[in-house]
Amino acid sequence: MLLLAAAGLVAFVLLLYMVSPLISPKPLALPGAHVVVTGGSSGIGKCIAIECYKQGAFITLVARNEDKLLQAKKDIEKHSINDKQVVLCISVDVSQDYNQVENVIKQAQEKLGPVDMLVNCAGTSMSGKFEELEVSSFEKLMSINYLGSVYPSRAVITTMKERRVGRIVFVSSQAGQLGLFGFTAYSSSKFAIRGLAEALQMEVKPYNVYVTVAYPPDTDTPGLAEENKTKPLETRLISETTAICKPEQVAKQIVKDAIQGNFNSSIGSDGYMLSSLTCGMAPVTSITEGLQQVVTMGLFRTIALFYLGSFDNIVRRCMVQKAKPEVVDKTA
């Protein structure tokens, strides 16, 4: 009886693997496709542009700094696979004026054709204790990280729906899945992206447009180097419990998931566990993905409790360490 049940389970899993591709999105062909990357002048955004260019795409880079854009353009063009490929640079702040963003997207489409994939990678980070952060910091991060993704997406969505093809990628963060000490402003802006993405996916799925949310861990980029200058001790120690990833590795995974139309894009085993743990009511791309989430949830939640306990211990140790000089002063 037990053997029969095991055989039935194996047969069921095999059936899921066979049926899953039939309900999954058709992969997006990158050769000749027009890919727009915001925040594409450095870091993960630039590496995503390179990865798409290596697969034959036409690239529009969007960022604020013209000098960095031109340097990124030169770096990307080294990876061309044919002489027809083009890298277009547009200098604009995607978080300030929707009409301006819409106009530059129209200009890009006039030159390189309709946008097949939009990668929202423009973003910034700021850390500090909740009561020590300026209120303007919360406004700034919501403007850049959230509205800086809303505006470009709004500018391309109508054409994608009309053509019934497209990919929209939102680059969030593991801090957009798990709230951490020092990231009250940053995490909230990254959590907002997921809510936007889930609602948008439900709207555009009937039009064969698919949304991907990427949750990269700490990545070796200029942005991380700048963030580390002011990062609280507690935040730094918690961050050091996981390895720093290379931007090329992160970019390759994001592009792969976007092509496949996967809603979640995670990096490494920790990223996979975190995405499974926080899946909630998020869309799934395949039956197999949903089954994996159901099967692993209990185990991953158990592991997560140990992580949370470790993080709380780090915060307590730092508090005790900071309190010691005060105790010495009172007894002196």
UniProtKB/Swiss-Prot annotation:
Protein's gene: Kdsr
- The protein depicted here goes by the name 3-ketodihydrosphingosine reductase
Gene Ontology BP, a term = sphingolipid biosynthetic process
Q: Where in the cell is it found?
A: Endoplasmic reticulum membrane
Identify the residues that bind NADP(+). 186, 190
Organism source for this protein?
Mus musculus (Mouse)
Which residues does the record give as NADPH binding sites? 39, 41-43, 64, 68, 93
Q: Where is the active site?
A: 172, 186, 190
Bilayer topology: Multi-pass membrane protein
Residues on the membrane's Lumenal side span: 292-293
Which SUPFAM superfamilies is this protein grouped with? Answer: NAD(P)-binding Rossmann-fold domains
Q: Which residues lie on this side of the membrane: Cytoplasmic?
A: 26-270, 315-332
Classify the main location.
endoplasmic reticulum
Q: List all membrane-crossing ranges.
A: 271-291, 294-314
User: Top-level EC class, please?
Assistant: oxidoreductase
Keyword check for Acyltransferase: no
- What Gene Ontology molecular function terms does this protein carry? 3-dehydrosphinganine reductase activity; NADPH binding
What is catalysed by this protein? sphinganine + NADP(+) = 3-oxosphinganine + NADPH + H(+)
Tell me the superkingdom of the source: Eukaryota
Signal peptide interval? 1-25
Supply the EC number(s): 1.1.1.102
List the PANTHER family hit by this protein, alphabetically. 3-KETODIHYDROSPHINGOSINE REDUCTASE (PTHR43550:SF3)
